[in-house]
Curated annotation (Swiss-Prot):
Name of the molecule in the record: DNA-directed RNA polymerase subunit beta'
GO cellular component, one term: DNA-directed RNA polymerase complex
Binding site for Zn(2+): C219, C221, C233, C236
Family according to the record: Belongs to the RNA polymerase beta' chain family.
UniProt-listed Enzyme Commission number(s): 2.7.7.6
Gene Ontology BP annotations: DNA-templated transcription
Gene giving rise to this polypeptide: rpoC
Keyword entries, A-Z: DNA-directed RNA polymerase, Magnesium, Metal-binding, Nucleotidyltransferase, Transcription, Transferase, Zinc
Cofactor binding annotation: Binds 1 Mg(2+) ion per subunit.
Record region (DNA-directed RNA polymerase subunit beta'): 159-1353
Catalyzed chemical reaction(s): RNA(n) + a ribonucleoside 5'-triphosphate = RNA(n+1) + diphosphate
Cofactor(s) the record lists: Mg(2+); Zn(2+)
Top-rank taxon, per record: Bacteria
Region feature (Unknown): 1-158
UniProt organism field: Acholeplasma laidlawii (strain PG-8A)
Amino acid sequence: MAKNEVLSLPVDSLKLSQTALDRLKLSGISRLEDFNTFNLKELQMLLSDSFNEVLPTLIYYKLPRDVRDLSLSDEVVSVLETAGIKDLEALTKYDKSTLYHVFKDDEFLLKEINDLFELYHEEKLSTLNVATEVFEEVALPQEVSVEDRVNKIIQPIRKTYGSKAFTHFKVRLASPDEIRNWSYGEVINHETINYRTSKPEPGGLFDERIFGPTRDYQCACGKKQTVNKGQICPKCGIEITESKVRRERMGHINLEAPVVHTWYLKNSPSRLAILLGIKAKQLEEVVYHASYIVTDPGQNTPLAKKQILSEQDYSLLVEEYGSRFTALTGAEAVKKLLQDLDLDKEVKNLRKRLKTSSKQKRDRIIKRLDVVEAFNQSDNKPEWMVMDVIPVIPPDLRPMVPLDGGRFATTDLNDLYRRILNRNNRLKKQKEQMAPRLITKNEKRMLQEAVDALFDNAKRGKKAAVERNRHLKSLSDLLRGKQGRFRQNLLGKRVDYSGRSVIIVGPDLEMYQCGIPREMAITLFKPFILRELQLTHGAEKKNANAKYERRDDDTWRALEKVVREHPVLLNRAPTLHRLGIQAFEVKLIDGKAIRLHPLVTPAFNADFDGDQMAVHLPLSPEAQAEARLLMLASNNILNPRDGKPVVTPSQDMVLGNYYLTIEESKDRNFGDDLERTKKHQEKHRHEGKFFSSIDEVKIAYENKDISLHTRIIIKPESVKDTFTVEQKNMYLVTTLGKIIFNEILPETFPYVNEPTMSNLSEKTPDIYFIKKGVNPKDALKHIPTPEPFKKRFLSMVIAQVFKLFHISETSRMLDKLKDLGFKYSTVAGITISYADINVYSKKKEMVEATEEEINEIEEWFEDGLLTDSERRKLVIDKWTNVKNEIQSGIMKEFDKDNNIFMMSDSGARGNVSNFTQLVGMRGLMSNPKGETIEVPVQSSFREGLTVSEFFISTHGARKGSTDTALKTAESGYLTRRLVDVSQDVIIVEDDCGSSHGVYVEAIKDESGKEIVPLYDRIYGRFAAHDIISPKTGEVFVKRNELITEEIGLAIVKSGMQKVEIRSIMTCTSSHGICAKDYGINLATNQFVEVGEAIGVVAAQSIGEPGTQLTMRTFHTGGVAAGADITQGLPRIQELFEARNPKGKATISEVEGKVKDISRRGGSISITITDTQGTEYKYTLDPNIEALVKKGQDVVAGQKLSSGSINPKELLRVTDVKTASNYILEEVQKVYRAQGVEISDKHVEVIIRQMLRRIMVIIEGDTNILPGTEVSIDEFKRENKEVLKNRGRLAVGRPILLGITRASLRSDSFLSAASFQETTRILTDAAIRSKKDELHGLKENVIIGGLIPAGTGILQEKFFHYDQPEDKKPIYDDFE
């Protein structure tokens, strides 16, 4: 077999152990040629102990081929390439003496080559007991297609070292020499493109000699010269190479006068001003040539170093002292001062002053010390903040595009560079012509402004503009904001292989399918179709293309084949949570709309009124495997937010199942309507009839002997086998509808006869059974007719099936439930018409009675017995009461056979409020200010509104639309901040070993009503200690064991009020959280796996229901009239941003007793005595209510007045647990008030991120400065180092940061810069030479690496992944 043929064969053919083969496949090496995609070091690291086993293969086939992949130094590679040795095969042909000559006897370089020869020694082929022919001589069977071979080795878990080429990302200041090294030449004039020839001007901003040719391998002289690749044309001086180098080659501009980098001067706080110890305003005056600064005060002068002189003072001093002193202006002065700085001396001096200074001076010294230390500890020099040379970015990143009519459209950067070049060249001329100092000074100022505009044109001061109102986009503007490089191009990219169309319902689809239009699929799957045509029809590339374009039968057949087993991703914007993108298998359909399974719509929040969805195609086998295993719609049944099913039937499906499970009694009373009674009795004439099998019942139904709702009696075992022994000896009373409903449930599921939880979880209630020998007619009178199955109950059924039978069975059941719903809503023939709506009979008299009462109230007001506000309140109360009375009356009057009532009662559509407005009265309306209008809308929609009623109704409609729009934007921004703060929280280990936990109890509101029950807070969490029953002493669950549903219910039943559970707040894992502290993964109901990105899930779970929250700030009546209580979205923002709340409550700072409560001038004064007898006084506002009484015991952090507590204050007077618990409870109260359930763990993740930093109070012997904020990890690290050396430890206190501030204080500068305040963060990172360790998700997305979550976490250095010898590899079982 020829070697080039062998290289395309799979590694399965190698004589290797199973472990070695598994390692190769996990690394992405499926064929021999794949070795060439790795370098030698990577292979050694990937294969670890299996490397020696694979080595003979590498030696025999000379792999990896390229000398660059042999892990040799750049110097060795360049010598080899110069000698024409470009691959391993060529290298091994040389003997050592020749190589000694090539390397000119350089010992160091020869040692590297010698080591390589030692490794690739031919003798190893025999010593390692491997046949010289490494492959077994087995040709692969011809019929096995490439696709089958690829599918066989799909790796669901893969260690892809190749995609993450670096371990960290560092940023620092560039020195002038480095800028010149980057450059390929100096730009000397402002010319761009010659308008006549359309070619770049020499020496200009697009010069081909500097930046490379504009056309591949073509210099300015003309012809394409691929032969002379890499050479420089002797005529025009242009290198003959690819044109893409114009995207990477930089130039430079040598400045005639130094300029200060504006980021370090104008960004607040000004780093230059702090470093030099000068006020920022004064420094700016010096830089812009308005003042002078003394750099050398000289002998016998009244001047001091760094003294600022005005132009006038400077002139007078020069006259008096001549050249005895030196004062400079502009960037030269700043550069001189920076060069004169002795950083070590400054640090010692400042540290000495720090110990003796007052509080105010200390703050200033710490600020300065921080900047000085940053420079001292990094490899930056302060004078590099002043630039003598500026880089010119590659021309293809600032293109000029020709327009019609000979004009050019250009990027703003070119204008900014041109300004600099113009001013620089003008200054050069002025210097040559010895121009007066005033003129050159002005030119230098203008040059400084031009460079400022290039680096950051959005800062204060003069902005360089094209027209009057549009300022030019500078380099900083390219990075910042939504349209900047970070957010537009790095964190979110547009992708190929995608389509979009309108969605329509596909009731015939399976849960895991979606309908894709053929026309769309044939374009999406084009490369796969072409490959299929080439494989099956042996078509050449050209012919396959022609076939594809003709759209002949072979093409359509190929399409049918490639879409099989190839999932696609469907996405609906806005993607508020991870269920907004799901995978489906393709079912090809005609038409142009995408068909969507009706049950998955709630997850996407989609409906079929014109919504559009995008389709994306996963290309690689790994992506397809991931889509199929993790993202398939039939696997995503539970909502990660609360663990409840997200796929609930809606509308028609609910209505159909409701109709199907209605149970009617023959004796139903219709009052005076004899005709209806007669029809009803005829319909159910065979009520109580005995049947021996389901088939018999169905025949009776076909023969119209019974209806779906008629009560029948049947042998239990003929229906299902899940009845108890006693029940099997009796007869079951049920209906055909319920028998049909139960047929879709799993075999071993209880027979559902009534909509109760006990029926689902235990057994069919005994009340529906008749003993043998009892008269059925009599027995039926005592058996109740249960309610039909409503939407809420259907959700309970789904949850119970999921719990008992898991995903596949549940998705099958859901499909059947959908089909049943559609079928029977059709059979039911439920329609609605005008005749179904009858105005409420008692409405007229109720309204008239209310009007009389209101007239009476008006009279009292005119007699002066009431104030206007009291009158208004009474009137509003009267109308509210009458509306409520009408509402309850309507529900009683509605006939349960009424179609509209059935729609509402089943939960399919509509609610009580809609009915009241349809047939009762619309009631009171609000005006645009949000105040209630006294005059109600008395009409209902059935009667029709008057003109004035219609007008006052429009206020609310308009306000509703506006609120929704505002709310959506606010909610989206909240989600973005939450994701940003928590994106790097990942499950990193199974157990951190923490021995601490948190006590949880039911969350109650002020009135004591339970908002979040104890069960919800403990289910799915791990016990921190053994949980023992207080009554019986029975151990419910041991430490570190999971609290399951049964255990949770038993704990609640035992009457325990508090339970200690493992919590995210007490987790000690660094860079993430451990699985034990997190609990179960709510989306799967399984133990959470290492690598799960729980931070993002938490942020989405909190942000997604954000749009359901209200935007209002309620104004409360009564005692606390002055306090606005914020609710809804603003309250959530207030809590997560840790802001001072509106209507803040006063809290006690100490534990003690209330000594006295007194009123003075309207305000209340509370005196508290602590345990030592010290008194503390608190004054409350006049209209705020005191919540404590005289003599009452209080604890630190207890509310003394009504309102919301400031969490920062609470943290100050109590501890982390109390403050975090307060935020958690308050967040839960807001969401639960809107009926949204969110698991505690999601809120805990966010709160943990808000409490990740410590304020250092005493620095001890650490390097941390007092008064600075550091992360807990850094604080521990520093203290650990000090402990080793037996030094004094640092002391700090925890601080609570709002989510925005916490994101900006992230340890990763890439993550923080891509969030907000980009330039400030990059400025700070540069002067500190910050290193980003790339631990979070965002940083890795930005650099284009694998994210450290899911399978990507396997490559992280703190994980070890070994596959046991004896186990079969994962992918062998994979189908």
